[in-house]
């Protein structure tokens, strides 16, 4: 029987490395950088005005002749003595500027015609954004594997980049079903796992290449999967159900010869499988809905998706660990006095999907332990 860490390592070793692609910056949000990016030049690239106001040659104030207006994008040259130059926000500051005073602090409190006079109060050096005050040339902007959010994209764009190298989202082929799934008889049930897996894939930045319905005929299912691989070119096949020891465990029948099927010392999601179909790895989860959800979060999302890292939280209620198996229970996180607190949500049975609504973490309960309220536990964010 494997531990959680052992099976995670096995899945990680079996799955392919992500492909590196050149991505337009406008489409890079939510992807991870496939290279480290450094600043080519300072940001801001030149001293510029933080306000609409006057560029002044002195901090002492006084009455000045109004010179030509400096708009954003102008090349201002130098600032003559005795002159106040109207300057707009973002405009390059002329040489010789000692300070900038907002127009509303002056008399008149608006911009008069060039050649008029303006009285300006004394002011220390202010409202000048210095070149390199945000980023200096040579500074690392984005590290490889960093998640590209809106500020990251803006910072890269400020360096004149229009494309970046990113890791392409992994593509999965989802295989779910069974004779009892989606039929019309009184003993059949709808397929909830396929849409759930698709939703989980979207949540963790994974693309769904296609779907295959399982049946109880191993040779027919193998042929369906082989055809789907040719059609959809997935990086990974993900299956749900059919991996235990029953009479109709069709996934196990197809893939056991070329893979590993066994148990991980956990609940839910104890039965697990890992195999290949030709060159495509196959990750096999148990079919109970909660087991599928937990398995996806623990073993697939952190390897080919963008799952948040686990962290420690304080348990709000006692919990007793199972003998020989650890648990990953659904729960919620709240913040109290700056401390993350974890509370259980719903029961522990693997079919209780509706009771998982609202859960935002999995709470890890070690085997053979007795936990009290206030103890620290490891939690795995679900979003």
What are these model-predicted stretches?
Residues 54-56, 80, 181, 228, ...:
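Alpha-helix C-terminal capping segments
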